């Protein structure tokens, strides 16, 4: 039994080093974190925009897509027909029309000096949606994950 505790502690420490890569900052809801990561009404400079995200996670995120639309318009996609997400859940929704977006990809650097390339796109998207949490806008469903770009 005494041997199990140090092993469990080691596993928790190792898990904690991996988990923050996908963890949502504690003071944000999933929808708020989605908005920070993926909603920018106008085109942007990837190095600056990604710096804001990377400051939350303390690492260089390898890739990120920003939708150039409002949170309200993206949330409206949650009212469309549900489809199956990449993870097998049935809470995804596809946009009916393409939107402008910027795809940012890590090219070099280590946090906090992350460098990104930018690619402008005009495509459809699929978002996962969930009921709002306390602090979210009062929609029936809110976007919480950018599942796919088509």
UniProtKB/Swiss-Prot annotation:
UniProt keywords, alphabetically: Antibiotic, Antimicrobial, Disulfide bond, Endonuclease, Glycoprotein, Hydrolase, Lysosome, Nuclease, Secreted, Signal
A cellular component annotation (GO) from this entry: lysosome
PROSITE patterns with a match to the protein in the record: RNASE_PANCREATIC (PS00127)
Cystines in this chain: 46-104, 60-114, 78-129, 85-92
Pfam family, one: RnaseA
Residues forming the catalytic site: 38, 145
GO molecular-function terms, A-Z: endonuclease activity; nucleic acid binding; RNA nuclease activity
Site annotation Critical for catalytic activity: residues: 61
Enzyme class: hydrolase
Glycosylation sites: 55, 100
BP term (GO), one: antibacterial humoral response
Signal peptide: 1-23
The UniProt record lists the keyword Hydrolase: yes
Subcellular location: Secreted; Lysosome; Cytoplasmic granule
CDD domains named in the record: RNase_A_canonical
Site (Facilitates cleavage of polynucleotide substrates): 59
Residues engaged in binding substrate: 61-65, 86, 105
InterPro entries documented for this protein: RNaseA (IPR001427), RNaseA-like_dom_sf (IPR036816), RNaseA_AS (IPR023411), RNaseA_domain (IPR023412)
EC number: 3.1.27.-
Family stated for the protein in its record: Belongs to the pancreatic ribonuclease family.
Assembly behavior: Interacts (via N-terminus) with bacterial lipopolysaccharide (LPS).
PANTHER family the UniProt entry points to: RIBONUCLEASE (PTHR11437), RIBONUCLEASE K6 (PTHR11437:SF4)
Function: Ribonuclease which shows a preference for the pyrimidines uridine and cytosine. Has potent antibacterial activity against a range of Gram-positive and Gram-negative bacteria, including P.aeruginosa, A.baumanii, M.luteus, S.aureus, E.faecalis, E.faecium, S.saprophyticus and E.coli. Causes loss of bacterial membrane integrity, and also promotes agglutination of Gram-negative bacteria. Probably contributes to urinary tract sterility. Bactericidal activity is independent of RNase activity.
Protein name: Ribonuclease K6
Organism: Saguinus oedipus
């Amino acid at each position: 039994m005494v041997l199990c505790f140090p092993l469990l502690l080691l596993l928790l420490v190792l898990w904690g080093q991996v988990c923050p890569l996908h963890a949502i900052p504690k003071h944000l809801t999933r929808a708020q974190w989605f908005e920070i990561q993926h909603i920018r009404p106008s085109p942007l400079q990837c190095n600056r925009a990604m710096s804001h995200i990377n400051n939350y996670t303390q690492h260089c995120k390898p890739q990120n897509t920003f939708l150039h639309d409002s949170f309200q318009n993206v949330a409206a996609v949650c009212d469309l027909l549900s489809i199956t997400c990449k993870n097998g859940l049935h809470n995804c929704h596809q946009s009916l029309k393409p939107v402008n977006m910027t795809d940012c990809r890590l090219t070099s650097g280590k946090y906090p000096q992350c460098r990104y390339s930018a690619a402008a796109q005009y495509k459809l998207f699929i978002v996962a949606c969930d009921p709002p949490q306390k602090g979210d806008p009062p929609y029936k469903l809110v976007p919480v994950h950018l599942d796919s770009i088509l």
